[in-house]
């Protein structure tokens, strides 16, 4: 297995874990389950997300693809999508109760729609806006 395929595997597993954890945490929060505020929910997701970020940066370096360049407009769009996904996930989980329950319920499926767009950009490498 090459280092690129190893990095790609780590990246894909991190994506699956990150989305699974977001979904689980949202469901626990929505059900008002005591585990929603457990210590592991504050430790594990940031570790997984950091691994996801680092593997993504390593993949960009290994493939010699840079965002904000003419050849990789899809990657630029993907990065903006990731930022939108993070904001929507933050609203959906909102532990500080800054947003209403309705806003959280709307933000979660929107985050999943943005995730779908990110996956389409990554697999097709065809920019949506370009």
From Swiss-Prot:
Keywords: Cell inner membrane, Cell membrane, Membrane, Transmembrane, Transmembrane helix. Residues 29-39, 94-104 are cytoplasmic. Residues 1-9, 60-73, 125-130 are periplasmic. It comes from Escherichia coli (strain K12). This is Protein YchQ. InterPro entries: SirB (IPR007360). It is a multi-pass membrane protein. Belongs to the SirB2 family. PANTHER family: PROTEIN YCHQ (PTHR39594:SF1).
